[in-house]
């Protein structure tokens, strides 16, 4: 099943109409960066798509802008600096993989029906529909999902401060918009340590509005584990690929490793799990896996403070290091030829 078919299956037009619009200025900025990225793609030579364009300044500028759009969805949500940094990293990787698909889909449009290279104006006009599909239609739903994931990740962080002192209870919004399959999970009550929350912690789908609250143990009886798992399985029966079965707070990610822009085995891949000694680990011989590896390498050179921008020399110095030494929590500067880390 292709990417757009997967999206049609898990998204649907009804969901798109529920998604909140992206601010016009953000959408316009993304549109400009898309055009610049297409200009870089237009200059590529050769008959085959070169994934290294992902690391180009134009593509990185687009990825960073797309990441910023997603980050803006939880700008006012209270959470630790570490959680925010890791959610931003998740947004960057998600944006990078999405960008790979946009570039890969745009590449064949470089040639006309006779096999001749188009003018840039015609090429850009032809790929505008790709921009509209990915960065308007899909982005609206992705923005909402990231916002919900971040809010629930922040909640999970607070839940963990209390450990199993309280039970956690699944709650719906109790209105006519609640999906019947989610309604069955309402009032499921379990300790935070129960594995139920690893698979059925909200959001459990695009535009899912479900939440989880802490409740006193003396007031509620816990739901039997097997019963809760059965209800969860029934609630997500339409999610046959298991795309939404993750805990954003526990994994510290806004989007699961397996999403519309990746493949099923990404859930168990060392790259996706952040095991960064990748030079010793084999990578599947396909463009998606190679793109994922490159996106993670770029993410390791990506700064999260929003205040420091790496020079080209700084970035190259980081990327020249072994992969297991590239990742750092905060870039603080360079003294001589030594990278300074916190």
Question: Where in this protein do the model-derived segments appear?
Answer:
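Internal glycine-rich, Lys/Arg-flanked active-site/core loops of soluble domains
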Residues: 112, 120-123, 128-164
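Conserved short secondary-structure elements within globular domains
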Residues: 146-218
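N-terminal leader/targeting and assembly helices and adjacent pre-domain segments
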Residues: 1-131, 216-342
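A broad, low-specificity signal for short, low-complexity segments enriched in glycine/proline
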Residues: 67-69, 128-133, 166-176
């Amino acid at each position: 099943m292709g990417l757009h078919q997967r999206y049609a299956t898990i998204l649907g037009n009804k969901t798109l109409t529920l998604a909140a619009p992206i601010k016009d200025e953000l959408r316009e900025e993304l549109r400009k960066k898309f055009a610049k990225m297409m200009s870089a793609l237009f200059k590529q030579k050769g008959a085959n798509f070169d994934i290294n364009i992902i690391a180009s300044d134009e593509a990185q500028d687009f990825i960073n802008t797309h990441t910023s759009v997603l980050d803006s969805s939880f700008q006012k949500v209270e959470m630790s600096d570490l959680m925010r940094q890791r959610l931003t990293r998740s947004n960057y990787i998600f944006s990078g993989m999405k960008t790979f698909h946009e570039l890969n889909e745009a590449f064949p449009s470089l040639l006309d029906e006779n096999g001749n290279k188009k003018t840039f104006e015609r090429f850009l006009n032809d790929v505008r529909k790709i921009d509209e599909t990915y960065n308007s239609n899909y982005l609206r739903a992705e923005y909402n999902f990231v916002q919900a994931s971040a809010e629930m990740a922040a909640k999970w962080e607070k839940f963990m401060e209390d450990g199993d002192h309280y039970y956690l209870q699944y709650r719906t919004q109790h209105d006519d918009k609640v999906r019947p399959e989610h309604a069955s999970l309402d009032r499921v009550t379990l300790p935070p340590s129960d594995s139920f929350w690893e698979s059925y912690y909200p959001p459990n789908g695009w535009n899912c509005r479900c939440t989880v609250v802490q409740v006193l143990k003396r007031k509620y009886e816990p739901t039997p584990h097997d019963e809760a798992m059965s209800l969860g399985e029934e609630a997500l029966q339409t999610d046959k690929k298991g795309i939404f079965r993750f805990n954003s707070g526990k994994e510290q990610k806004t989007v699961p490793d397996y999403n519309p822009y990746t493949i099923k085995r990404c859930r168990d891949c060392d790259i996706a799990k952040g095991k960064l000694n990748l030079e010793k680990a084999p990578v599947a011989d396909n463009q998606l896996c190679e793109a994922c590896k490159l996106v993670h390498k770029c993410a390791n050179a990506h700064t999260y403070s929003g205040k420091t921008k790496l020079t080209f020399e700084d970035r190259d110095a980081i990327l020249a290091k072994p992969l297991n030494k590239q990742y750092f929590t905060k870039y603080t500067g360079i003294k001589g030829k030594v990278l300074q880390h916190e």
